[in-house]
Every structure is written in structure tokens, then in C-alpha cells.
């Protein structure tokens, strides 16, 4: 996976000091950002030129104390040909030697008004997301009450129809049929649609539906974190289903664990309403209210009361 410098410019606002068409096509292959403090002092033993080079106040201040050809010689080493882009934060002045070094190595040179730590965070977050390894899962990804919900189940069970009904009830579609899943950080899983299927739902017997055209921009979302999974399965009276909600299932995607609720489907059940209830119950548990525990406490109190009687 790689991100071009042009992709970075399309996403984050910078003032371009120097660029060329070839420099804009250079690839960023890591989300780690280099702040070349020791390098400006001449120590290059662990220098990693393939990273973005970010100059903050400290690096810039030291650079400005170096004068004459020494400054240019240092900058030529820091701004190596392998370096994809050099960024100067805080709208700090760009010395002519830095522009000359950028031209020498054909590197895009950018300036940002953002504080260095803030810019570092924005860059890392963007690159982590874009460079993350993606896997494809079959299902419907929705934003329901602000919760990212991945709806899965056997083919033909009604996942897309449930998603369409949820859109009609005011929730937002992220992806239908193919969901591209990626790990945004160590504990967060996110999902987005395949570009060709963005804003689309396929309903058997009807065909492809453009959700944004029919229901408006508020009915779709580009991506969402996956907070819970719901699995639709055909009702089987011989199979035991969780009736109290005290036996949660955990599924794993890309090494991230996600709580799963399994919902039996049969004629006459309003699946979209049940999905909404499952999501609201999930939110309530996150807020500290557990209806199952409340019921168990009441049952324990009732049994104790009957024994005393």
C-alpha cells in the first residue's frame, strides 16, 4: 500500500512552496513521521529518508543558526531523493537553501500554518487509515443511532432489504454487499464501501438503488467505525438462541474483537426494528445500564423473598 504526495495534498491543506509533476507522484509508504532534529546537528546514523520530514520550531530554530554552505549541505542530506515530501509547520519562514535542496532532489516542499504536534497527529491519522491493510467481508454496513453496525448473514436472508428499511427509518448506509474493512488503530476497526458500489443497494427483484439520489445526502456515509456486528440467521426451533442477552458472542476482524448479536429471522418478524432494538441495547450497556442484569437482580430478590415467606 502507498499514498502519493498528490493524494496527501488533495486531503490536507498546505501552501505549496515547490513541486513538480514527478515529485507529486512520489509514494509515501509509512505513516511514521520524521522530525530531523539530530540530523540537523549532523548525526545521520539512524536517519530514515523514506519518511515524511517534518520541521517544527525546534528543527527550524537550529537550522537557522547554521549559516552559509553548511546549511545547504545539511539540508541536502535531510532532503534525500528517497524522501517523499518535506513539510514546515507553523508558517515558519522557508530559507532559500531549503528550496534549493528541494529542487536538487526533486522533492515537494510544503508549508503549514498548523502547530507541529497537531500536524503530526493529522498526518499520522490520515496515513494510518490510507495505508492500513484492507480485507473484504460480505454484508451491509450501517450507521444506526451513531453506532457502526455490520449486518451479516447467509445469502438471500434479507440483509440488503433490512438495510433499505433502516435507511427509510432515518439511518445511514455506508456499504452494501462488499464492505472493505481495515484496522484504523490497535483497537478500532473501520469499514467503507468499494468505490464502484458507493451509495448503492442491490435489492433482488428491483435491481440497483442509488440511495443518495432517492433519500438524499443524509442517508449515506463515506465510512464508519465498526462498533458491533449483527448476524441474521434462519429461525430453527431446534436451535437454542440467547433469550436473556447474557451470552455475548465475539467475532474477530483483522485482529480486532467486535461484539456480535445473532438474530433469528422468520416470517412476520420486523427485522429492522429488532436491529434498532439491539443497537439501542448495545448503547445502553455502554452507558452502564444492563437490562439483563436488572432482570437477574429482580429475579434473585423475588426468589429470596419467596424463601423468607
Swiss-Prot record:
It comes from Lactococcus lactis subsp. lactis (strain IL1403) (Streptococcus lactis). Residues 201-210 are annotated as: Important for the catalytic mechanism of both phosphorylation and dephosphorylation. Gene3D superfamilies: HprK N-terminal domain-like, P-loop containing nucleotide triphosphate hydrolases. Belongs to the HPrK/P family. ATP binds at residues 153-160. Keywords: ATP-binding, Carbohydrate metabolism, Kinase, Magnesium, Metal-binding, Multifunctional enzyme, Nucleotide-binding, Serine/threonine-protein kinase, Transferase. The keyword RNA-binding does not apply. The active site is at 138, 159, 177 (proton acceptor), 243. Its EC number is 2.7.11.-, 2.7.4.-. Homohexamer. This is HPr kinase/phosphorylase. InterPro entries: HPr(Ser)_kin/Pase, Hpr_kin/Pase_C, Hpr_kin/Pase_Hpr_N, P-loop_NTPase, Ser_kin/Pase_Hpr-like_N_sf. It comes from the Bacteria.
Amino acid at each position: 500500500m502507498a499514498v502519493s504526495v498528490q493524494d496527501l495534498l488533495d486531503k490536507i491543506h498546505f501552501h505549496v512552496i515547490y513541486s513538480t509533476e514527478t515529485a507529486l507522484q512520489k509514494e509515501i509508504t509509512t505513516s511514521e513521521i520524521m522530525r530531523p532534529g539530530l540530523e540537523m546537528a549532523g548525526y545521520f546514523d539512524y536517519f530514515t529518508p523514506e519518511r515524511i520530514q517534518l520541521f517544527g520550531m525546534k528543527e527550524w530554530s537550529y537550522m537557522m543558526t547554521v549559516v552559509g554552505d553548511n546549511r545547504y549541505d545539511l539540508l541536502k542530506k535531510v532532503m534525500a531523493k528517497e524522501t517523499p515530501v518535506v513539510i514546515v509547520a507553523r508558517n515558519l519562514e522557508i530559507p532559500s537553501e531549503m528550496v534549493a535542496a528541494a529542487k536538487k532532489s526533486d522533492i515537494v516542499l510544503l508549508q503549514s500554518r498548523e502547530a507541529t504536534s497537531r500536524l503530526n497527529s493529522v498526518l499520522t491519522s490520515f496515513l494510518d487509515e490510507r495505508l492500513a491493510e484492507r480485507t473484504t467481508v460480505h454484508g451491509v454496513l450501517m450507521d444506526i443511532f451513531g453506532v457502526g453496525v455490520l449486518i451479516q448473514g447467509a445469502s438471500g436472508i434479507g440483509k440488503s432489504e433490512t438495510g433499505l428499511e433502516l435507511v427509510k427509518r432515518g439511518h445511514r448506509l455506508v456499504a452494501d454487499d462488499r464492505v472493505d474493512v481495515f484496522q484504523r488503530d490497535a483497537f478500532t476497526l473501520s469499514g467503507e464501501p468499494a468505490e464502484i458500489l458507493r451509495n448503492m443497494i442491490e435489492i433482488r427483484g428491483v435491481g440497483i438503488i442509488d440511495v443518495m439520489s432517492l433519500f438524499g445526502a443524509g442517508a449515506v456515509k463515506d465510512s464508519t467505525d465498526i462498533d458491533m456486528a449483527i448476524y441474521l440467521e434462519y429461525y430453527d426451533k431446534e436451535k437454542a438462541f440467547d433469550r436473556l442477552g447474557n451470552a455475548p458472542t465475539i467475532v474477530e476482524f483483522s485482529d480486532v474483537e467486535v461484539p456480535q448479536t445473532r438474530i433469528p429471522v422468520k416470517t412476520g418478524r420486523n427485522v429492522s426494528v429488532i436491529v434498532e432494538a439491539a443497537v439501542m441495547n448495545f448503547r445502553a450497556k455502554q452507558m452502564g445500564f444492563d437490562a439483563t442484569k436488572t432482570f437477574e437482580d429482580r429475579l434473585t430478590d423475588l426468589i429470596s423473598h419467596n424463601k423468607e415467606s
